A protein has these predicted regions:
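Short phosphate-engaging motifs
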Residues: 38, 95, 110
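Active-site alpha-helix of zinc metalloproteases
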Residues: 17, 96, 115
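Hydrophobic structural segments characteristic of membrane proteins
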Residues: 2-5, 112-207
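Short, glycine-rich, amphipathic interfacial segments at transmembrane boundaries or analogous
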Residues: 53-95, 156-175
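Alpha-helical coiled-coil
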Residues: 99-100
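A hydrophobic, helix-centered structural microdomain
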Residues: 4-78, 186-207
Length: 207
């Protein structure tokens, strides 16, 4: 596999993207603490019997393992090593709480990842990280591509996710994660971010 080198424009953009992540996550945390998280935390405490927050090991930039944080959307007896997107549809439905389904449809469960962005584990936009305990196939697929997803910070949303269909397929994800790194840039990130917002509102409206 050939070594990939970022373009000059990408090298300039990457520190700027990190600055956006720091400032954006600080603003987001303040807003969420004020208007959102307190009531989600209280409701989820009752629903999950006192376990409202969930942490799971994921692979980040340069394959470094970090703990991604989110509001718990699954029952306590769900497999802690599997992300909901890695479960088959029947298992996901049986393990999902009623309130958890709402959190996932609206993507509110992902908002705690603002803390991951702040500390530098993640970015707003980037390849979506899979669970560290079940990502071997995805890692193999990603490493077949140049560039690959592990060259950049993983994101809350990514290019593979907005492609919608078959986004759970490792080959599909690896291909579009590689394409994201190739096209990495400010306006491309804005486009992915905007499409993500439309997709979230569309999913919530559709339910």
């Amino acid at each position: 596999m050939d070594k990939y080198t970022f373009t000059t424009a990408q090298k300039i953009y990457l520190p700027f993207k990190r600055l956006i992540g720091i400032l954006g996550s600080i603003i987001g945390i303040i807003v969420c603490l004020t208007f959102l998280w307190w009531w989600v935390f209280i409701i989820n405490c009752f629903v999950t019997k006192g376990h409202p927050v969930f942490r799971q090991e994921r692979y980040g930039k340069n394959e470094k393992v970090f703990k991604m944080v989110k509001f718990r959307s699954m029952k306590l007896d769900a497999d802690p090593n599997l992300a909901p997107s890695e479960m088959n549809e029947d298992t996901q439905k049986s393990m999902e709480t009623g309130f958890g389904k709402f959190l996932r449809i609206t993507s509110i469960d992902e908002t705690l990842q603002l803390f991951n962005i702040l500390v530098g584990d993640m970015a707003f936009i980037g390849p979506r990280p899979g669970s560290a305990h079940n990502e071997e196939h995805l890692r193999e697929c990603r490493k077949k591509y140049t560039p690959n997803a592990y060259m950049v910070r993983p994101g809350i949303s990514g290019y593979a996710q907005i492609k919608m269909q078959r986004s759970h397929d490792p080959e599909f994800k690896a291909k579009w994660d590689s394409e994201y790194v190739k096209r990495l840039g400010f306006f491309f990130d804005i486009g992915v971010f905007g499409y993500t917002i439309l997709k979230v509102f569309g999913a919530a409206k559709g339910r």
